[in-house]
Amino acid sequence: MIYFISKKLEISAAHSLTLSYESKCSSLHGHNWQIELFFVGRELNQDGTVIDFTHVKKAVHGKMDHANLNEVFDFNPTAENIGRWLVDLFPECYKATVQESFGNTAVVVDEEKIRGIEHLVP
């Protein structure tokens, strides 16, 4: 069997972007980020889960919620870079959607984690 699960989170956090062009996003500003993480498992762990939802929330909220993301990360905190960080954070996570505001969403997929089962991915 293959198990697919997802976890939705809301994070309140601020950031400023370092960009090669003039933008108001270069100033410190905040968002209520909507994040959805997608996990895959070919087996369940000893507790009968792919990953514990509360562990996911604790790891992400503990690092990002009510934080200045420029002080948290050593990379430019774009939605795309945050998505990549989230996918890399959990071995079971193959996809992250990171919405910083309505209409502005990045989707990051780790193709290696779903190689061979792409046709099954919801």
Locate predicted features.
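Charge-rich, low-complexity N-terminal segments
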Residues: 1-122
